[in-house]
Amino acid sequence: TQMTHQWSRREEQQLPYKIVESGPVQEVVEEEPNLYDLPLCLHSDGNNGKYITGGVLIAKHPDMPMMNASFNRCQLVAKDKLHVRMMPPQHLGIYYEMAEKQNKPLELAIVLGSSPAMMYSAASKIPIDRDELEFAGALSGEQMEVVRCKTIDVLVPANAEIVIEGKVLPNVREEEGPFGEFTDSYVPIMKNHAFQVTAITHRKDAFWHDIYAGGREDLNLLGLPIESEVFNHIRKFATPEDILD
């Protein structure tokens, strides 16, 4: 497809972001956050509570100035606390392991209402030494404007809708799940990570973006990077005449 060709052409590219002083996503700053004020959804009857599924999770590398972005399910457990599933080999899980070895929390922002380029970058499989905010710029062809979070040292898209700021606590695992996954089955209760919320910022007229696991949006987001990866492998062993869209 045309999108696959464009992805393959741009996946080696980076476009540096631009740090700005303020942006729409920080029009309102809630220093005493209450997650119960947000419209989290109960996606399946067997889920153990409400989840954030459409959030792009952005974290800074513990030792280097680069940002990772990914999708991870986040279970609501208190007005200022979420349980987050993030395990190696996913890059966010590796970031957490690095921070935990230093007995430090991992600063993390959950971004709702990102641009399509940011969301596709978060779903990508680019190497861990690449910055996914810069990759989002390469995908869109435009320099992304970012702002620094209010309570943590993480950069987020200035034009997003909502940002939940916080820290993933070291050496803490608590029960999360069950959760209905894209496989049309439930993952069981497991020990996962505790995310302590420190602030919420948002537009004055912010909207909430939700993704149903296994729905069309979910499969499109996850499918394009995989399709491109398969396409690139085929190109290594086939002539141009052998490849059909």
Please name every model-derived segment.
Residues T1-A194, T198-D245:
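Extended, highly charged
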